[in-house]
Regions:
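Outer-membrane beta-barrel translocator domains and adjoining extracellular loop/strand segments
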Residues: 44-53, 97-104, 149-158, 193-200
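Bacterial N-terminal signal peptides that target proteins for export
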Residues: 2-13
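Short N-terminal segments immediately surrounding and downstream of signal-peptide cleavage
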Residues: 31-43
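Bacterial N-terminal signal peptides
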Residues: 12-22
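Sec/Tat signal peptide C-region and signal peptidase I cleavage site
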Residues: 24-28
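N-terminal, post-signal-peptide region of Sec/Tat-exported proteins
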Residues: 51-85
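Gram-negative (and chloroplast) outer-membrane scaffold detector with strong preference
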Residues: 29, 40, 72-154, 173, ...
């Protein structure tokens, strides 16, 4: 049921964004951009391991940094040049290090093996604001995110995902009227749920929080 609702919200957000694009004035400033950078995740928090009707609250689990890459598409309104809307997608692949796992109840598990985590984030409609200062444009944005994730331990892979929050703060520099480069700090929060994690009947829930320092190139129409 939750996955169906998330899918419906995703489709609705995409349709709303496309409708806004098609109904905007022809003079509206549109842009596309590519971005790449460094993902700096916090430890996974609020870790809940559920099996056999019992929930184990586990300690936070460390993640290593990774490369982040993605793309943006958006536009600024002609009547409100400081206000715009943007959709973006980006992927990170932080590594879950091998570490000792305990529960808040004091139960000690063996060392958990390392795991490969990938998180694909789609922010369908970030609201963005900017301040035009000649060639320089500081900007900020915020929006909901939808996250699709894979967690691989040994030969087993579990798929999951969940909603989240996406924020950004950056500085754009116009090389020409159409070509721009930018640097950006981005924060991503997500609650990730994995069903039948490693084996059937075991579910895992975690909070994923990460800073991203990115650079990119954009083309403005």
């Amino acid at each position: 049921m939750g996955k169906r609702m998330t899918a419906r919200h995703s489709v609705f957000a995409l349709l709303s964004f496309l409708l806004a694009l098609t109904s905007s004035p022809a003079e509206a400033e549109m842009y596309v951009a590519g971005q790449v950078g460094l993902n700096l995740p916090h430890s996974l928090s609020n870790v809940e391991d559920r099996r056999g009707g019992v929930t184990f609250d586990e300690n936070d689990q460390s993640l290593k940094s990774s490369v982040m890459y993605g793309a943006k598409l958006g536009y600024y309104f002609e009547s409100l040049k400081w206000l715009g809307v943007e959709t973006e997608v980006f992927k990170t692949t932080p590594y879950l290090t091998q570490q000792h796992v305990t529960t808040l109840g004091g139960i000690n598990f063996l060392n958990a093996p390392g795991a490969h985590l990938s998180v694909l984030t789609w922010a369908p409609a970030n609201i963005v604001v900017r301040h035009q200062m000649g060639a320089f444009e500081p900007y900020a944005g915020i929006g909901l995110g939808f996250n699709s994730s894979r967690l691989s331990v040994g030969r087993g892979t579990s798929k999951g995902g969940g909603p989240g929050l996406n924020t950004q703060l950056g500085l754009r520099y116009r090389i020409t009227t159409n070509l721009a480069v930018f640097g950006e700090w981005k924060f991503n929060h997500a609650n990730l749920e994995y069903t039948d994690f490693i084996f059937k009947g075991r579910d895992l829930s975690v909070n994923y929080n990460a800073h991203n320092v990115v650079f990119g190139v954009g083309y403005h129409f």
